[in-house]
C-alpha cells in the first residue's frame, strides 16, 4: 500500500487520537501531543462528515476541558490549525483556545 506524506500524517494523528481517547477513558490526564491529536482528529472527522468550517471551529472547543489535560497544557495550546478535507475540497480550520 502506497501512502502520500499527507495520508501518513492523517494516520499518525488518528493513531495518536485513538491512544489519547483510550487514556482519557481510563481517567488519565492527557499531555500536549495527545490533546492536540484528539482535537485535530475530531476536526478532521467532522470535515469528513460534511460539517462547516465555522461549526468545526466551535465544536473543536468542546472536545476537551482543563480537567481532561495535565496542568499547564491548556495554556500551551493557544490555537490548533488543521488542514481538513471537506466534500468540496481541503480547507484550513483554526480552533482558537481549544481547551477551556
Swiss-Prot record:
Q: What's the Enzyme Commission number for this chain?
A: 3.5.1.5
InterPro entries associated with the record: Urease_gamma, Urease_gamma/gamma-beta_su, Urease_gamma_sf, Urease_subunit
Report the Pfam families cross-referenced here: Urease_gamma
Question: What reaction does this enzyme carry out catalytically?
Answer: urea + 2 H2O + H(+) = hydrogencarbonate + 2 NH4(+)
Give the EC class as a word.
Answer: hydrolase
**One of the GO BP terms on file:** urea catabolic process
* Pathway noted in the entry: Nitrogen metabolism; urea degradation; CO(2) and NH(3) from urea (urease route): step 1/1
Q: Which UniProt keywords apply?
A: Cytoplasm, Hydrolase
Any one GO MF annotation of this record: urease activity
> One GO CC annotation, please?
cytoplasm
CDD domains listed in its UniProt record: Urease_gamma
Q: Where in the cell is it found?
A: Cytoplasm
Output the SUPFAM superfamilies linked to this UniProt entry.
Urease, gamma-subunit
What family does the entry list?
Answer: Belongs to the urease gamma subunit family.
The protein's assembly and partners: Heterotrimer of UreA (gamma), UreB (beta) and UreC (alpha) subunits. Three heterotrimers associate to form the active enzyme.
What is the name listed in the Swiss-Prot or TrEMBL entry for this protein? Urease subunit gamma
Q: Which organism is it from?
A: Variovorax paradoxus (strain S110)
